[in-house]
């Protein structure tokens, strides 16, 4: 009888835990083979081969025109990068890292005697929805939190991301 009672309590506990809203989603669709960001249009596309799987509205760095060169310039990088990691503990809901700076970015900044910056991400907007409109990040790509949950589940490490002006 004691065993049945424990089993029942565990079943209830797991059942209630499963009812909670989780920011971690499961994606079982086609592999995202590339990401394209079109800064001028404020759009991001997740693509499988030649098929656009998803399209998102984005916000960029607070000084978005041009390629990121230095720490604090407020620009979002341009060029080819890779998804470097997933961060489930981001202060912006969830985030995935972008491999900025690359070798060329680093060489240019060092040649100028400056820091290229880093920690560029695709992330959510937690607590920034009402305070900031338009481009507000330090150089990252921001999307709505619900969209970020979807993107987080769809992207894999080393997925190429092409960021166009």
Language-model regions: role of each:
Residues 15-18:
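C-terminal motif of bacterial Sec signal peptides marking the signal peptidase cleavage site
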Residues 24, 30, 80, 85-165:
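Exported/periplasmic cell-wall-interacting domains
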Residues 28-30, 37-39, 51, 76, ...:
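Short, surface-exposed loop/turn motifs at beta-strand boundaries within globular domains
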Residues 35-66:
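Post-signal-peptide N-terminal segment of Sec-exported extracytoplasmic proteins
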Residues 66-83:
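Short, surface-exposed secondary-structure junctions/capping segments
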């Amino acid at each position: 009888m004691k065993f049945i009672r424990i089993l029942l309590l565990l079943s209830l506990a797991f059942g209630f835990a499963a009812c909670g809203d989780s920011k971690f989603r499961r994606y079982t669709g086609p592999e995202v083979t590339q990401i394209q960001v079109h800064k001028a249009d404020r759009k991001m596309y997740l693509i499988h081969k030649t098929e656009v799987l998803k399209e998102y509205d984005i916000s960029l760095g607070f000084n978005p025109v041009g390629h990121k060169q230095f720490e604090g310039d407020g620009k979002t990088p341009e060029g080819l990068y890779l998804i470097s990691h997933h961060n489930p503990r981001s202060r912006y809901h969830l985030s995935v890292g972008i491999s900025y700076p690359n070798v060329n970015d680093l060489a240019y900044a060092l040649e100028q005697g400056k820091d290229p910056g880093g920690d560029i991400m695709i992330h959510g907007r937690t607590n920034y929805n009402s305070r900031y409109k338009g481009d507000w990040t330090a150089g990252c790509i921001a999307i709505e939190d619900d969209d970020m949950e979807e993107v987080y589940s769809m992207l894999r490490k080393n997925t190429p991301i092409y960021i166009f002006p």
